[in-house]
Structure formats: structure tokens, C-alpha cells
Amino acid sequence: MLLETRHLSKVYDNKQAVNDLNLQIETGSFTAILGPNGAGKSTTIQMLTGLLQPTAGEILYDNPIKLGVVFQNSVLDDMLTVQENLEIRAGQYKDIDKGKVDSLVNQLGLQNFSTQLYGTLSGGQKRRVDIARALLNSPDILFLDEPTTGLDIQTRKAIWELIHQLQIKEKMTVILTTHYLDEADDADMIYIVDHGQVIAKGSANRIKEQYAQNFLKVFVTDTADLKEILKEEIPFEEVRVNELLIHPETTEK
């Protein structure tokens, strides 16, 4: 086991951000932590990478290992070129091969904009550079905290294809957070979290088979008119006051 957490918890000002989290990460695996905004995903990443101290629980690594992290917000300098940013970061590590920056520039397709200022790049280009920066020290685990946030669908797909290929070719251990199930499709293990707790886990296929449902939850101030419209057309149930769960039989309507 490369990484394991036991009963990991984090409390901020009496608010439980992460609650009794148990993860098991195998060497060379692709693990996705999936959940909505505020579920505790970023807090978990920050604890796993040593940026936050847990309130309780343990984080166990198999021997000292090197970590690479792609944060939601970039840590690179907008006023430096891509090449300059990467060379400065490379200089902060010991024993990095002199050709490492050039190798990553080629591997991640940064050649066409390596001399541009980082601040002038598109969102997708910045993400590629951010990933290159995280790979400078040849990490044993690459952490990606919602790396496609704010990107359009085509750019999202390109970034995830890049990450997937890196994971396969380099046999890299990858841990990512996302709120898109499709981005976790290639994961060996998915942990679905909500309010800081794991509520489901398994492969993408198992998660979809066991938990995916075709329904729409609707919140309204008064359900009377909506129920009148729906009763002849679409099955529904009233789960709480002013809250309906609609079960469409098809997505074509």
C-alpha cells in the first residue's frame, strides 16, 4: 500500500470538513475523489500533501516518497515565460537532470508557447504548464485538485486525455479530485464524498450500476401546480415539503 489514511478528520471552527476518511492507494493506481463543491475534497488533498494538519486520524506513506501537486489555483508567475517558470522551479530541487525542463516541454506539448508569458496563456495551456511543474521532481504520487475547473468541455477532454496517457505510460500513481463522474471513468477506484464522508466507493462501472439513477430533484415554493401538471405525464414522489423527485422515463422530452 503506497498511501493509506485511517479515520482522517479535519474540523474548522466547529465545522466538520472531513470526517473519518479511510483511503487506500496502491502503487501505480489512478484514484478519484468525487463530490460536489464543499464536500471536503480540497481539504483532503491539503492534508495528504502536508499543507494541513489533520484534527484526528493518520496518514501513512510507504517509505519517504516524492509528491507532485497541481492546485486549483496556479502557483506560477504570470510575468515570467513558461520556460523561465519551469527552470526556476526546477532549481528548487536537488539532483534534477539538466534536460528535465526541455523533456517535459516536449512531452506535454508546450513547445509552441514555451517563450510566452505564463499570464498570457489560455486556461488549457496554463493547466499543461501546471502539470509540467508538478512533474519536475518525478513524483511518486501526482495529486490533481480539480484540474479542469473553469475550462470548456473540449479543453477538459484534452487535459484528461493527457493525464490518462501520463498515468499509463509512466505507470504513475495519480490521485485527483473532481465533481465530474465522466472524468473519473478511467479510475481504478472512485471514492464519492459528501460533507467530508465517503458515501460510496468502487470502480466507475460499479458506481454507475449501483447508484446512478434517472431522476430530477425539484425544489419549489408551492408544489400544487407542478403536481397537477406532472400527474398525467411523469412519475414523481414528494420526498419533503416543497421537494419533488421526478422520474422521467426518457430524456427525449
Regions found by a protein language model. Give the residues of each.
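Catalytic Walker B motif of ABC-type/P-loop ATPase nucleotide-binding domains
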Residues: 142-145
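Helix-to-loop junction immediately C-terminal to a conserved catalytic motif
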Residues: 49
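ABC transporter nucleotide-binding domain
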Residues: 162-245
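Conserved ABC ATPase signature
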Residues: 117-121
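Conserved catalytic motifs of ABC-family nucleotide-binding domains
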Residues: 138
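Conserved ABC ATPase "signature" region
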Residues: 87, 98-113
